[in-house]
C-alpha cells in the first residue's frame, strides 16, 4: 500500500531504509516523547522495527519524493474494525520540522483511514510537553479530549509523561 501526496510517499519501510530511519530517529529531540524508541538507536533496532512493521499494513515510512529517503514514520495501531477506530502515531526527523510535512502526512493518513478503511474515529495521545505534536493534531482538526496522568513512559529517557488525549471523528473533517 502506498499513499502519494504532493511532496510525500507513505509506504511500508524495507530493510534498505534502515540507515535513513537511524539517521532521523537517533536523536533525543525526536525520541524523547516516543514510548517504544530507544536511545541511542542502532541499525539493529531499525532492522527489528522494520521487520515488525512489515507485518502491519498500516505502518508507513514518510518518504520525501525529492530524495526517496524515509524521513519519519506514521501509522495506525490498535485498529478495531468493529468499532471503526484506530490510534495514530508518528515521528519526523528534526531537520524536517516546521515545513508542513507532518501536516501533509497526517492529512493523507486521515483520508486513507476514513475513505479506504471506513473508520469513524481516530485518536492520538501526545506528551503534555510535546507542544508541536499537540499543535499538529489541532491543526488537522483533532480535538483535545482529556488528560491522562503518567500514561506514557519514553523508552529513550525512562521518563513518565502525562499525555493529552485527542480525537477526530469522520464527521469532523471534509475529505
Task: Name each region found by the language model.
Residues 12-13, 38-40, 57, 67:
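Proline-rich intrinsically disordered, low-complexity coils
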Residues 1-28, 63-175:
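Acyl-donor (CoA/ACP) binding surface of acyl/acetyltransferases
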Residues 45-47, 53, 136, 159:
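A generic membrane alpha-helix/interface feature
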Residues 29-51:
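Conserved GNAT-fold acetyl-CoA-binding loop/helix
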Residues 50-61:
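A short helix-loop-beta-strand connector motif used in the catalytic cores of GNAT acetyltransferases and
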Amino acid at each position: 500500500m502506498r499513499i502519494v501526496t504532493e511532496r510525500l510517499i507513505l509506504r511500508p519501510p524495507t530493510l534498505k531504509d534502515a540507515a535513513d530511519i537511524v539517521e532521523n530517529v537517533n536523536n533525543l529531540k525526536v525520541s524523547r516523547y516516543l514510548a517504544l524508541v530507544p536511545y541511542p538507536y542502532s541499525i539493529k533496532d531499525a532492522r527489528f522495527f522494520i521487520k515488525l512493521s512489515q507485518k502491519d499494513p498500516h505502518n508507513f515510512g514518510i518518504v520525501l519524493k525529492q530524495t526517496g529517503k524515509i524521513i519519519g514514520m506514521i501509522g495506525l495501531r490498535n485498529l478495531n474494525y468493529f468499532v471503526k477506530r484506530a490510534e495514530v502515531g508518528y515521528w519526523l526527523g528534526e531537520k524536517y520540522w516546521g515545513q508542513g510535512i507532518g501536516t501533509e502526512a497526517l492529512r493523507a493518513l486521515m483520508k486513507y483511514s476514513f475513505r479506504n478503511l471506513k473508520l469513524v474515529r481516530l485518536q492520538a495521545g501526545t506528551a503534555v510537553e510535546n507542544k508541536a505534536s499537540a499543535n499538529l493534531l489541532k491543526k488537522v482538526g483533532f480535538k483535545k479530549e482529556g488528560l491522562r496522568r503518567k500514561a506514557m513512559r519514553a523508552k529513550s529517557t525512562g521518563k513518565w509523561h502525562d499525555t493529552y488525549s485527542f480525537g477526530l471523528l469522520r464527521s469532523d473533517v471534509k475529505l
